[in-house]
Amino acid sequence: MSKRAFNFCAGPAALPDAVLQRAQAELLDWRGKGLSVMEMSHRSDDYVAIASKAEHDLRDLLDIPSDYKVLFLQGGASQQFAEIPLNLLPEDGVADYIDTGIWSKKAIEEARRYGRVNVAASAKEYDYFAIPGQNEWNLTKDAAYVHYASNETIGGLEFDWIPETGGVPLVTDMSSDILSRPLDVSRFGLIYAGAQKNIGPSGLVVVIVREDLLGRARSACPTMLNYKIAADNGSMYNTPATYSWYLSGLVFEWLKEQGGVTAMERRNRAKKDLLYKTIDASDFYTNPIQPSARSWMNVPFRLADERLDKPFLEGAEARGLLNLKGHRSVGGMRASIYNALGLDAVEALVAYMAEFEKERG
């Protein structure tokens, strides 16, 4: 097999080699059963065991309290932008949202279709280069919930703190930083995460929801979007994304073998520290984000001359450093360094950055 490239894509993102190798080994014949997981009935004993183990391992990794349901749903995180207000926002209620970038803005726009939204704080005041401190937030006392995106994959902003909401349920889009380090799940009413960054392949979204928030859906909420129905049916009201669920379970097993989220925190800290140190030590590369708000998972950076972007990307690809082009709305470069990428990937990237700067700077 040819050497695998280092994939810095924001999503769908790199998966651990060990997970892909195991999936390959089990592709045609899962544990001597003579069929692929893709061919299994989702209601068979074998598949139910696969699904149950995935949930058990995720609960173990994040130490999820027993009064929370873990749902493996379809539609990605973007569908949650509608599903959350349909389940949690009364028609005469108001929801607080924090705007820190493109994904939180999309959530705000969708929620406004279903009810009143109060944008309690916005990073726009800081050109989206910093996160407003909670002393700047204008929260609604009796809000149905407070929503924020813990990490903005495009802009590269990440909360390094959990907001205080005074008993109002806290809802977070954790698509790109879930499982990157330890988390106190009990601080949240609901956590959701699209799988294709730090969990597994696309086609799946994981929702962790406190049980007392179930059963609040509007009467007009579609059956398929009702959290309580999903919970009551073990996320199998209809056929789930079976293979994505299975692969996510393999990722959870791999994470436990690596030492869990505490080990991931050490690994991810080393990666992001090396990359930001390289950028900050250079006059050729820049990252505009306030240091306290810099993302551990998505590191945007610019070259001194944007005319060098194309040759930089071409040189990177020739060295097996893939998908470093920044989002079209931001430009520049972006290195997404999720759990599956090791320190060796970042070491290879910074070595190339130094080489390119020496030649073109």
Swiss-Prot record:
Pathway as given in its UniProt record: Amino-acid biosynthesis; L-serine biosynthesis; L-serine from 3-phospho-D-glycerate: step 2/3; Cofactor biosynthesis; pyridoxine 5'-phosphate biosynthesis; pyridoxine 5'-phosphate from D-erythrose 4-phosphate: step 3/5
Organism annotation: Pseudomonas paraeruginosa (strain DSM 24068 / PA7) (Pseudomonas aeruginosa (strain PA7))
One Gene Ontology molecular-function label: O-phospho-L-serine:2-oxoglutarate aminotransferase activity
Role summary: Catalyzes the reversible conversion of 3-phosphohydroxypyruvate to phosphoserine and of 3-hydroxy-2-oxo-4-phosphonooxybutanoate to phosphohydroxythreonine.
EC numbers on record: 2.6.1.52
Residues that bear N6-(pyridoxal phosphate)lysine: 197
Subunit structure and binding partners: Homodimer.
Cofactor detail note: Binds 1 pyridoxal phosphate per subunit.
Chief subcellular location: cytoplasm
Highest taxon above the source species: Bacteria
Keyword annotations from UniProtKB, A to Z: Amino-acid biosynthesis, Aminotransferase, Cytoplasm, Pyridoxal phosphate, Pyridoxine biosynthesis, Serine biosynthesis, Transferase
Protein family: Belongs to the class-V pyridoxal-phosphate-dependent aminotransferase family. SerC subfamily.
PANTHER family, sorted: PHOSPHOSERINE AMINOTRANSFERASE
Source lineage: Bacteria, Pseudomonadati, Pseudomonadota, Gammaproteobacteria, Pseudomonadales
Pfam family, one: Aminotran_5
Cofactor(s) in the UniProt record: pyridoxal 5'-phosphate
CDD domains: PSAT_like
InterPro entries, A to Z: Aminotrans_V_dom, Pser_aminoTfrase, PyrdxlP-dep_Trfase, PyrdxlP-dep_Trfase_major, PyrdxlP-dep_Trfase_small
Protein's name in the database: Phosphoserine aminotransferase
Gene: serC
Keyword NAD in annotation: no
Gene Ontology process terms (BP): L-serine biosynthetic process; pyridoxine biosynthetic process
Gene Ontology CC, one term: cytoplasm
Binding site for pyridoxal 5'-phosphate: 77-78, 103, 153, 173, 196, 238-239
